Amino acid sequence: MRSPIKLEFSEKYDKDHAREYFLKHQDGLARRLSHKRDEQLARRALALAGEPGLVLDLPCGAGRFWPLLAEKPNRVIIGADNSEAMIETACAAQPPEVVARVRPLQTSAFAIDLPDNSVDSIFCMRLFHHIGESAHRKTILSEFQRVSRDSVILSLWVDGNFKAWRRKKLEQRRSAKTEQDNYQNRFVLPAETVEEEFRAAGFRIQERLDFLPFYAMWRVYVLRKG
C-alpha cells in the first residue's frame, strides 16, 4: 500500500540524515536529559494504556524508543517508518537483543500497510508537530482509528506555554523581515483544535502528559477508542 500524501520533510531521510537523527538525541547533556524525560512520559503513557502487548511504533525513526518498548518481556513491537534508511539505521544502531524483538515495516502513517484492528496500541512520537494541515492530521487519525484495537499514544507541540509564546514572537519577527514565505515543517498547534480532531476521529482523551507544564511545547496524549 502506497500513500497518496507526500510531505516535503519526509523525503530528506537518506542514510546520512538517518544516522544524524540517531546521534542527535545523544549529543550533549541537555539532549540526553530531554530523552530521559521523554522516556518517563512514554513509560507513564504505556502504563495508562494498560501496557499493550502488540505495539506499532510509527514513525520509529532510528529506534530511539525500541529499548523502552522492549522493557515489557512479552511485548511484540512493529517498528515502522516511511523511510527505509531510518529502519535500516535503527536495526543497525539498537542493541541486537532489542532488534530481535522488532518486526520492521516500511509504511506511511497516511496509509498504514496493516489490517484493521491489528495492534493493541499505536505509539506515535515526534510526528504530529510536523503536520500543519488539518486534513493531513485527520487522514492519519483515521488510519490510527482503523489499525489500533484500543489506544494511541502520540506527542506534539501545543500552545498555552512559554516556549510556544516565544516561538510565535520569533516567527512574527522573521516574517516581518522577509516578504517571502519560508518553508515550515514544525508547527505549534492549538490544543483545543487537535483535541477536537481527536474526538472527531472517534477517540476519547484519557490523559494529557506535559513535558514541563506551562513551559515546554511537548505534550503526550493517551487516546482510547470509543
Task: Spell out what each predicted region is.
Residues 138-150:
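A short glycine-rich, Lys/Arg-flanked "PGG" loop and its adjoining helix->strand segment in the class I
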Residues 1-49:
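Conserved class I S-adenosyl-L-methionine
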Residues 111-116:
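Short conserved loop adjoining the S-adenosyl-L-methionine
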Residues 158-200, 206-209:
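C-terminal alpha-helical "lid/dimerization" subdomain adjacent to the S-adenosyl-L-methionine
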Residues 123:
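A conserved beta-strand element that flanks and buttresses the S-adenosyl-L-methionine
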Residues 64-110:
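Class I SAM-dependent methyltransferase SAM/SAH-binding core
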Residues 59-61:
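Class I SAM-dependent methyltransferase "Motif I" SAM/SAH-binding loop
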Residues 149-157:
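Conserved beta-strand signature within the Rossmann-like core of class I S-adenosyl-L-methionine
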